[in-house]
Design a protein with these regions (language model features):
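Short beta-strand-centered segments that line the small-molecule binding cleft or hinge
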Residues: 39-84
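A short alpha->loop->secondary-structure connector
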Residues: 67-73, 93-94, 114-124
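Small-molecule pocket liners
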Residues: 70, 79-88, 181, 187-193
Length: 329
């Protein structure tokens, strides 16, 4: 029987996610691991055959994993690939100077873009540790006492900490046309499976998700092709849908970009499932944005993402070299 190490954080609760698919996992024994360094050593020695871990941490260890000849071979279904604002009111109803706690540089800029007069602070200014359930509950108590107006956390962390305050999704909402959007941080809500090179990832298909694995491939590619000093300021949205669902949504909100991409001049539409990718960078004050978007058949994803990144690099080169270029850390 194979052994799989499972590593969880409050933002990416891998154990909780596994409960949904546990009945479909065959011939694999699960073992909770306390830190990733030990997990990599166990995978290298053969004590483990697989490791399940948050994709953002796997990305951070990418150089080490490449040197150890490990590969990401599959991913779990994403539930809520976005952050939430825990607050009694949405951003549109915040008072001028309202206080929000947020440790994500990208979301800091996105909030500035939506409401420039909000006071955005880091959690440590209130001596709060946002990676623990206790810390998040303390932040919720500060809302109730009126010391702050809200705070930003992962949707998964909201559930894991047992929070019950009102929450507002910070995502790319098609219904909110005309309002600045929230493109997710890289690898948000993405949990992946790592194995030694050569492992047959297709044998895990009964309980893993191709959509999520494609999301890993796309986000990894975007990050590889984006200068490292900009990584914490880039937002990446990826989803795939059947053509009927995409058209229904686009027609409801009158999204001409999507409709023009999917319907040919004769009014015909093929029935291939489509991917949607949005990559975005914001200026420090959140007032200027550069982005690139693509929609296409999933069958062309591996080719299209490379052409898209060529265009993305051309955009970045222009804005990083101009005298008034605004894409700065």
């Amino acid at each position: 029987m194979e052994q799989m190490g499972v590593y969880s954080t409050i933002h990416h609760p891998s154990n909780d996610r596994l409960e949904v698919v546990r009945e479909r996992i065959k011939d694999i024994e699960l073992e909770e691991v306390q830190n990733l360094e030990d997990a990599w050593l166990a995978l290298d020695s053969g004590d483990l055959d697989l490791v399940l871990a948050p994709a953002n941490l796997v990305w951070n260890d990418r150089i080490k994993l490449a040197s150890m000849q490990f590969d990401v071979v599959a991913a779990l279904t994403r539930n809520h690939p976005h952050h939430v604002l825990v607050s009694e009111d949405g951003l549109e109803h915040f008072p001028a100077g309202g206080i929000v706690l947020c440790d994500e540089p990208l979301i800091h800029r996105q909030i500035r873009r939506r409401r420039n007069k909000i006071d955005i602070r880091k959690f440590d200014t209130m001596e709060i540790e946002p990676t623990t359930a206790e810390g998040l509950r303390t932040a919720q108590n500060l809302i109730q006492s009126g010391e702050i107006n809200g705070f930003v956390t992962h949707r998964g962390a909201y559930d894991a900490a047992g929070l019950n305050g009102r929450r507002h999704a910070l995502h790319n909402d098609p219904e909110a046309r005309g309002l600045p959007r929230f493109v997710p941080t890289p690898f948000c809500d993405l949990i992946v499976i790592i194995a030694r090179q050569g492992y047959p990832g297709h044998t895990l298909s009964d309980w893993t998700d191709e959509h999520a694995f494609n999301s890993w491939i796309v986000q990894r590619t975007v990050m590889h092709r984006t200068p490292a000093e900009l990584h914490e300021f880039v937002g990446i949205h990826y989803r795939q849908q059947q053509i009927g669902s995409i058209l229904t949504e686009a027609e409801r909100v009158n999204d001409l970009f999507i409709l023009d991409n999917l319907i040919d001049p004769e009014g015909d539409v093929d029935d291939q499932p489509r991917y949607e990718i949005i990559v975005e960078l914001l200026s420090k004050d959140g007032l200027r944005t550069t982005s690139i978007e693509r929609i296409g058949p999933i069958s062309r994803l591996s080719v299209d993402i490379q052409f898209m990144m060529n265009d993305w690099n051309s955009i970045l080169e222009r804005f990083m070299t101009e005298a008034d270029g605004f894409i700065q850390p």
